[in-house]
Amino acid sequence: MSNLTFFFDQLLSYSYLQQALTAAILVGIICGVIGCFIILRGMALMGDAISHAVLPGVVIAYMIGASFFIGAVITGVITALAIGYVSQNSRVKEDSAIGILFTAAFALGIVLITGMRGTGVDLWHILFGNVLAVSRTDLWVTLGIGLFVLLIIILFYRPLLLSTFDPVMAQATGIPVQMIHYLLMLLLSLVTVAALQTVGIVLVVAMLITPGATAYLLTNRLPVMLCLAAMFGVISAIAGIYFSVIYDVASGASIVLVASTLFALAFFFSPKQGVLTRYWRGKRAKEMSATS
């Protein structure tokens, strides 16, 4: 039996694997789409900060029996506001404020997790993910978050577009640029929550940035970039789950490695931006000029 046949046999036989694959695909789509705006706005570090800063909110939500995604959203928004406040009211620049606050929040989350070791509750899967343990409830939550995020992006596409490429012009036309920024932070927090079970907090930034960065190397048009990023997210999810099942390795890490491989291929072989493509094009141009 070939590996591919074995994978499909397992997929058709076990519902948990079907749920895992569906959840991973959903996460790949929404991470790819929201990641495009993060990349174009130069907010990769902010994306890293928010994805790590939600950890204490998730742990506290577990501790008090509340919904973990509410805790994550609250913590993510508070962190975004705190970063803006510190950078605007001190000599500390935004990148420094991000580094200070997100590491502090992440450290608090680690302390809270280790403090719960004697309670019988294991929250370490939040850090590294375990997509094969996704329940039907988790799947519905992920689907709900995904639909909400995509709906908001569709409804606010024009303000997001203008504030991303020309915030001064957007402000002049009456678009509340600051509110759009915090809306994006809210969506980022939601996407992080959706990705917790799949790749975990440690690796979620890779899924936020890598598919979008890969698409960015292949096109200059935002609609095409959004579609390509979503497609790369889906490919990474499917291939990552496949390698996880076949070779019995961590699913989250497998998904991220596939996404990184796709980026490497685009980096070297992209028709316009690829390093090797530009080298070959330049070499061919020199040969043609030498023979003419």
Swiss-Prot record:
Its predominant location is: membrane
Instruction: Give the matching CDD domains.
Output: TM_ABC_iron-siderophores_like
Q: Where in the cell is it found?
A: Cell membrane
Q: What keywords are annotated for this sequence in UniProt?
A: Cell membrane, Ion transport, Membrane, Transmembrane, Transmembrane helix, Transport
Q: List GO terms (cellular component aspect).
A: ATP-binding cassette (ABC) transporter complex
User: Could you list the residue ranges that cross the membrane?
Assistant: 20-40, 58-78, 96-116, 137-157, 168-188, 190-210, 226-246, 249-269
> Looking at the record's lineage, which domain of life comes first?
Bacteria
GO process annotations (BP): monoatomic ion transport; response to zinc ion; transmembrane transport
InterPro entries under this entry?
Answer: ABC_BtuC-like, ABC_TroCD
Query: How is the protein disposed in the membrane?
Result: Multi-pass membrane protein
Q: Of which family is this protein a member?
A: Belongs to the ABC-3 integral membrane protein family.
Q: What does this protein do?
A: This protein is probably a component of a manganese permease, a binding protein-dependent, ATP-driven transport system.
Tell me what this protein is called: Manganese transport system membrane protein MntC
Species of provenance: Halalkalibacterium halodurans (strain ATCC BAA-125 / DSM 18197 / FERM 7344 / JCM 9153 / C-125)
